[in-house]
Amino acid sequence: MRRKRALKLRRKIRAEILNDRGPYLTNRRVIDLWFRYINRAVFDNQLPNFHKILIKKWLKRAMGQVCAYPDKNPKRFELEMLKKYRTKRDFIETLAHEMIHLYQFALKKDTGNHNSTFYSFRPRFKFIGLGLSQ
């Protein structure tokens, strides 16, 4: 993680959530924008783009999820996000959370579980002002 990029992202997050009243409605453009910000600052632009991004009215017991299709050639990764979040902070934290799963699947060839690889990002998230939970 580059410190200068991380500081810039931390300032951006603080500014965005300062007057966050909610609910927050998301769309593809905003997802792409925040994906680029987080990928640059936290993952050093290593993450591949999702092959498909779906915005859903509801997900069973989740605020977002990554679907991995490792048997396909090439491997495919899809992101599913909710259309409406309680706050913009919830949206940003959910997207960043799912980006860790993408990192696990695409770069580490990991299971994508909430394991030590997943939680190794907790200090980075804390530095930029985000929480990391299951």
Question: Which residues does each PLM region occupy?
Answer:
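Active-site-proximal or metal-binding-adjacent scaffold patches in catalytic folds
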Residues: 1-93, 102-134
